[in-house]
A protein has these predicted regions:
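Hydrophobic, helix-length membrane anchors
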Residues: 1-21
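Cytosolic nucleotide-binding catalytic cores of signal-transduction proteins
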Residues: 19-146
Length: 146
């Protein structure tokens, strides 16, 4: 729990009841479970586990939690679905690395996509453009000349 701020704790304190759309029932998630999952997610991010292809179910298993809980916690805390959460982490990581590692600027788009865990160049390009406003090749050409 070392990386969790008081704001996150307070925010998740309000997450006791989450609606399960498929059964139209209420799932109760205790504060302890929420904080535990958030701590494990923070650890996952710090260890850059998002750089490998990963699914909601495989991450839930790795974090020793329920996929529905994990999905709801990500949806509520990050205000995005699981795929967007993972892909955004990947793009943020790449943008940071491009600032410090000039060798990455020489990679092909396909190689960059695979290096940060994307299975397809198309998904990488779409996410990259959504995040930066530029397609990857334009962005790389721009930073190469700086």
């Amino acid at each position: 729990m070392s990386l969790l701020s008081k704001n996150i704790k307070n925010f998740f304190w309000s997450l006791f009841k989450l609606k399960n759309e498929s059964q139209n029932s209420i799932i109760e998630i205790s504060q302890d479970i929420i904080l535990n999952v958030m701590d494990k997610l923070s650890n996952f991010e710090n260890k850059q586990g998002f750089l490998k292809p990963i699914s909601l179910h495989s991450l839930a298993k790795k974090l020793q939690t329920n996929p529905k809980y994990l999905s709801k916690i990500i949806n509520t805390h990050y205000e995005k679905n699981f795929s967007s959460y993972i892909n955004d982490l990947r793009i943020q990581y790449l943008l940071k690395e491009l600032k410090t590692d000039d060798s990455l600027k020489k990679y092909t788009i396909k190689t960059l996509a695979k290096k940060i865990g994307f299975r397809s160049t198309e998904a990488f390009s779409k996410t990259f453009k959504k995040h930066t406003g530029f397609n990857p090749s334009t962005y790389l050409n721009t930073i190469k000349h700086k």
